[in-house]
UniProtKB/Swiss-Prot annotation:
<dbReference type="GO" id="GO:0035597">
    <property type="term" value="F:N6-isopentenyladenosine methylthiotransferase activity"/>
</dbReference>
<feature type="binding site">
    <location>
        <position position="110"/>
    </location>
    <ligand>
        <name>[4Fe-4S] cluster 1</name>
    </ligand>
</feature>
<keyword id="KW-0819">tRNA processing</keyword>
<dbReference type="GO" id="GO:0051539">
    <property type="term" value="F:4 iron, 4 sulfur cluster binding"/>
</dbReference>
<dbReference type="InterPro" id="IPR005839">
    <property type="entry name" value="Methylthiotransferase"/>
</dbReference>
<comment type="function">
    <text>Catalyzes the methylthiolation of N6-(dimethylallyl)adenosine (i(6)A), leading to the formation of 2-methylthio-N6-(dimethylallyl)adenosine (ms(2)i(6)A) at position 37 in tRNAs that read codons beginning with uridine.</text>
</comment>
<dbReference type="InterPro" id="IPR038135">
    <property type="entry name" value="Methylthiotransferase_N_sf"/>
</dbReference>
<feature type="binding site">
    <location>
        <position position="193"/>
    </location>
    <ligand>
        <name>[4Fe-4S] cluster 2</name>
    </ligand>
</feature>
<feature type="domain" description="MTTase N-terminal">
    <location>
        <begin position="31"/>
        <end position="149"/>
    </location>
</feature>
<dbReference type="InterPro" id="IPR006463">
    <property type="entry name" value="MiaB_methiolase"/>
</dbReference>
<dbReference type="InterPro" id="IPR006638">
    <property type="entry name" value="Elp3/MiaA/NifB-like_rSAM"/>
</dbReference>
<comment type="subunit">
    <text>Monomer.</text>
</comment>
<keyword id="KW-0479">Metal-binding</keyword>
<feature type="domain" description="Radical SAM core">
    <location>
        <begin position="172"/>
        <end position="402"/>
    </location>
</feature>
<feature type="binding site">
    <location>
        <position position="190"/>
    </location>
    <ligand>
        <name>[4Fe-4S] cluster 2</name>
    </ligand>
</feature>
<dbReference type="Pfam" id="PF01938">
    <property type="entry name" value="TRAM"/>
</dbReference>
<keyword id="KW-0963">Cytoplasm</keyword>
Amino acid sequence: MPTNIYVTEEELKKQEKIMKEIAEENKGKNLYYHIETYGCQMNVHDSEKLAGMLEKMGYKYTENLEQADVLLFNTCAVREHAEIRVLGRVSQMKELKARNPNLIIGVSGCMMQEKNVVEAIKEKYSYIDIVFGTHNIYKFPQLLWEALNSQDIVIDIIEDTKNVIEELPVKRDSNLKAWVNIIYGCNNFCTYCIVPYTRGREKSRKPEDIIAEVKELAQKGYKEITLLGQNVNSYGKDLDEDITFAKLLYKLNDIEGIERIRFMTSHPKDISDELIYAIRDLDKVCEHLHLPVQAGSNKILKKMNRKYTKEHYLEIIDKVRSNIPDIAITTDIIVGFPGETEEDFLETLDLVERVRFDAAYTFIYSKRAGTVAANMPDQVDDAVKHERLERLIELQNKISLEKSAELRGKIVEVLIEGISKRDSNKLTSRTRTNKVVHFVGDESLIGKLANVKITETKAWTMQGELVEVIR
């Protein structure tokens, strides 16, 4: 596996040329593609880039797998369950390939950065045409061209790139909201996490490239951007210029046309006063902070290599809420980490009760080969993990319900995102604190900011009445 390569301008021009050649060859043909995406928002945005390249090469999107000429699976390696699900799904494609031998099937993403997975694909899934990872998406046109012109499986995995690849075509899922990468990779090496091995070391995009992308989005009518990174708080540390994540937020806040700025994910050890003040003071930065705590026991946090304590985390929460009283705080929590006792788990429940998160994404610890935690003694019994997860979910659901109920009768600002999937007479909107509100309204309001009065609340969604359109 080649390590840490530098991608030259010549290489990118070569890929551009191949895209044009494939597009020319596809002229007049009705060719279709389908992409299935697993995992985080980074993967979702990677799939948007793959879709952008496919559209530039003359393919159109289809929901119908039977109609597809190119079928891609963009995979996630964070939890074992996700890997099993992906491989199960890929195995179902054998019959589809038998019915349509010209179908190109590709598997990409974080799972492909694991050597054992690539070997398994070669041995058990001979009908797969293309295998590539997270670092060479830019090379997809060439890989597709090779697959179209060969009977052999095309495998291209690199360990990392020294530079950030800019200006890949993007076919965005929304005309209103956009994902914007600001930093790739992770340097934290939490003992349970495979991400540093699949996504590489931290690489920040240059601020001028981010600003140019956001300005272009504003010109196209996008209202909301979400800044993406495994740890956005590390942004700029690897750059030669004087730029931090908070300073980047100030620059983006000045861009005309953008109404809302969100970001994810933040590591608690890197939360700065500067960032807290930026969220407080910048009118476009939404009052929502996703701050994964993972556990409430100092013993477990140390074993996880999280580099903060329960007390430090609670201090951060106090500082955030004293500066931004109405902020919504969400988190990630893992139960059943190796060595977690009942006392350790009770520390987690105590933290949840004290912080009162608006929502928590809760997971059972999943052993990942190649991580430090996979070889730790005292692995927790599965039945115990599931029992603890149920108790945690029960507590958090109660808190989420109570937090939502606090908004009943209040008027909140929402961005109207589209027609409700469950009731075509209603619109779906989102508050600045990232809560979903449904209300009766005309579809001409989509893309507008409005004030809505909350009439009913559940743990995750709310019902409201339109008060006024802001703009």
